[in-house]
Amino acid sequence: MHSRFIAVTLASLSLASQAVAWGCIGQDCNQAADQIAFSAPEPASYEGKVKSLAWEPTPGQGWQWSSCGTGDEVVNVESIVVSPDPPVPGQNLTVRAKGTVKDEVSDGTFADVIVKLGLIRLLARRFDVCEQARESNADLQCPLSAGEYELEHTVALPREIPPGKFNVHITGENQDGSNLLCLDLSIQFGFRR
């Protein structure tokens, strides 16, 4: 299931980067029906939780993530590893994730994803987690039992991703209304030569 959230995040990043590449930002993107409003936690809640996503512990390679939750969420992500790092527009990106699901995840579970380029909000969208898993023919399907999971997912990044720092914030709720997860990703795309 963690791979599904990362895949949803990367799909959102792909949509957002294409919107930027086509000069389409905000309400002009025909995303109005999908846009929702919610707030990110205060930066103080991130202290001590930032981890590098590089295959080797090399700072500044393009990715960072942090858990912005309280630890009581249904899904607790323990590690995320990406390759290549830094990510390269127009190439495949492989994401490996490891974590724990505390309670069953079933129909009615959703994830809210916000993608920003700097301070500009490119995308805010709610995803039905189980529906996304079915549509993408994911290895794990709902209902998902409590347990530990390690998953790998590869996504094609569009060539049109502009240079810049993308910030992705993911939250959600389980089918019973409990907090699903809280995850922040910072993704730096460099200048093409």
From Swiss-Prot:
What would you give as a GO molecular function for this chain, any one? sterol binding
The family database entries (Gene3D superfamilies) matched by this protein are listed as: Ganglioside GM2 activator
GO biological process terms held by the UniProt record = intracellular sterol transport; sterol transport
Q: Which SMART domains match?
A: ML (SM00737)
Task: List the propeptide residues.
Answer: 22-54
**Which UniProt key words apply to this protein?**
Lipid transport, Signal, Transport
Where does the signal peptide begin and end?
A: 1-21
Of which family is this protein a member? Belongs to the NPC2 family.
* Subunit-structure text: Monomer.
Name of the protein this chain belongs to:
Phosphatidylglycerol/phosphatidylinositol transfer protein
Native species: Mycosarcoma maydis
Gene name of the record = NPC2
